[in-house]
Design a protein with these regions (language model features):
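Short, well-ordered beta-strand elements within core beta-sheets of diverse protein domains
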Residues: 26-32, 124, 232-233, 263-266, ...
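Residue-level signal for inorganic ion chemistry
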Residues: 39, 85, 146, 177, ...
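Rossmann-like NAD(P) dinucleotide-binding subdomain of oxidoreductase/dehydrogenase enzymes
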Residues: 105-241, 366
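Residues at or immediately preceding the N-termini of alpha-helices
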Residues: 17, 36, 54, 239, ...
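N-terminal Rossmann-like NAD(P)+-binding subdomain of aldehyde/semialdehyde dehydrogenases
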Residues: 1-113
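ALDH superfamily catalytic-core signature
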Residues: 4, 9-11, 172, 205-346, ...
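Conserved C-terminal structural/oligomerization subdomain of aldehyde/semialdehyde dehydrogenase
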Residues: 329-332, 336-486
Length: 486
């Protein structure tokens, strides 16, 4: 397929973006309800492209990060995208089927259903940490729902942006799917377009900006944000296993994951044992030479590395104890650092105020499960919560008494990668959800359709009021009120 580029267009990048939006809206108006076959064809084409481009995409991500394992990119960015496309292809017929609903007894002779109608043009704003999966996941949901899609990719992943643009341009016209990257120097302008829905993944601060811009057009938004996702380790759970899994969560993509465990809550008498187990787990996974270890991901750029270093400096100056999982702290040139465990954290430190988004693991001591739950509830509602326990009583209590976007028990992150369940936040960690059927519903308009039976007595609701049938209906359904209430 041919897609125009800014070089081929005489106007500005913003004008080009607005032109594409107009084209997509016109395309949607010409075909507002793509058939099941048409939607499946698009999803099959997308899946084939992901498989074809897997090596090139993984290499592009590696180039943008300076170092990220090709296998890690394939497992986390690409495999998830293929599985999500497969899931949509397999279940789309059922999702598209109108949902029959029961009428009230009074309307029994009529038919009632909910039809799921494409919304129109969907805007997708993608973060840099998983630039492929977090572009293709919403794209799959939007195509399954029958929409047209404009994707705004992050400025700091130019190699991935170019490869995604090329991959999608081969199978989609720009009035179906269009990609924008670093040429849009004012990303806020993207959010002011009158989309029919916006999907944004990023920080709560930017999410609020997106939501304010969308409000000008009354555009509904799905916000996948972040927060400080806790990991609660119970006294009944093997400490070494919990430390291994939490450390893996902090080391994967160097902790640059919105659902990475942000901090660990550990029984106070087990802190030292947990620290040693975490250090041992890190060395087993990556050895002592992460400078030359292709399995360990770099911090994406110098600015983000400095932010992480500044957070550690702030904590140290305020009395925290910092323990690197390896014998050195930073590979400055390669922007790599081992997981750093931080003890004696206090609420005034940046490390306990900000989402860390890097290989830093504060470990907070607790006395009782009551204390741990209270600690979690004292902060904003996180995108994820992790609970390590063999007690169903403890597990159920934590699930009942805490709020989070999703939960994995006895590990981290796995609730996100199953496509038959929704992924989304709550409160400060986001609103709305996608993946699987929930993604289809999120990007569809649920339209209620009532078909009147020709013998339905609509005159029951017409004036003049006070007829025998009206009084009978009122008496039957409302019973008798309390005449003493004045």
């Amino acid at each position: 397929m041919e897609q125009s580029t800014l070089k081929e267009y005489s106007g500005s990048a913003t004008e080009h973006m607005e032109l594409i939006f107009s084209k997509q809206r016109a395309n949607f108006e010409a075909d507002p309800y793509p058939s099941l076959e048409a939607r499946r064809t698009k999803l099959h084409q997308l899946k084939k492209q992901i498989i074809r481009y897997q090596d090139a995409l993984a290499a592009a991500i590696n180039a943008d990060f300076s170092s990220r394992s090709l296998d890690e990119s394939k497992l986390l960015d690409l495999l998830g995208s293929v599985l999500e496309a497969d899931h949509a292809i397999h279940h789309l017929r059922r999702w598209m089927r109108p949902s029959k609903r029961r009428t009230e007894l009074l309307f029994l002779s009529n038919r009632l259903s909910v039809q799921y109608q494409p919304k129109g043009v969907v805007g997708v704003i993608v973060p840099w940490n998983f630039p492929v999966y977090l572009a293709l996941g919403p794209l799959i949901a939007a195509l399954a729902a029958g929409n047209r899609v404009m994707i705004k990719l992050p400025e700091i992943t130019p190699n991935t942006n170019a490869m995604l643009r090329r991959m999608l341009a081969e199978v989609f016209n720009e009035d179906e799917v269009a990609v924008f990257g670093e040429e849009i120097t004012d990303p806020a302008r993207f959010t002011t377009l009158p989309f029919n829905h916006i999907v944004f993944t990023g920080s709560p601060a930017i999410g609020k900006v997106v939501m304010r811009a969308a409000a000008e057009n009354l555009t509904p938004v799905t916000l996948e944000l972040g927060g400080k996702s806790p990991a609660i380790v119970s006294r009944n759970y093997p400490l070494a296993d919990a430390a291994k899994r939490i450390t893996h969560g902090k080391a994967t993509n160097s902790g640059q994951i919105c659902v990475a465990p942000d901090y660990a809550l550990v029984p106070k008498e087990s802190i030292d044992e947990f620290v040693e187990a975490a250090k041992s787990s890190f060395i087993k996974m990556f050895g002592h030479d992460i400078e030359n270890n292709e399995n360990y991901t770099s911090i994406v750029n110098d600015r983000h590395l400095k932010r992480i270093q500044d957070i550690l400096t702030d904590a140290q100056e305020k009395g925290a104890l910092i323990i690197p999982c390896d014998t050195y702290s930073f590979d400055q040139q390669g922007r790599r650092m081992p997981v750093h465990i931080v003890l004696n954290c206090t609420p005034d430190m940046r490390i306990m105020k900000e989402e860390l988004f890097g290989p830093i693991l504060p470990v907070v001591a607790y006395d009782s499960l009551d204390d741990a739950i209270t600690y979690v509830k004292s902060d904003e509602r996180p995108l994820a919560l992790y609970c390590f326990t063999h007690s169903s009583i403890e597990r159920d209590r934590i699930l009942r008494e805490t709020h989070s976007g999703g939960v994995t028990i006895n590990d981290w992150g796995w609730h996100v990668v199953n496509h038959d369940a929704p992924f989304g936040g709550i409160g400060n960690s986001g609103m709305g959800s996608y993946h699987g059927e929930e993604g289809f519903r999120e990007l569809s308009h649920a339209k209620t359709v009532f078909i009147r039976h020709r013998f339905f007595p609509t005159q029951l609701f017409h004036p003049p009021y006070g007829t025998f049938l009206q009084k009978l209906a009122i008496r039957f359904f409302l019973k008798k009120g309390d005449p003493s209430i004045k």
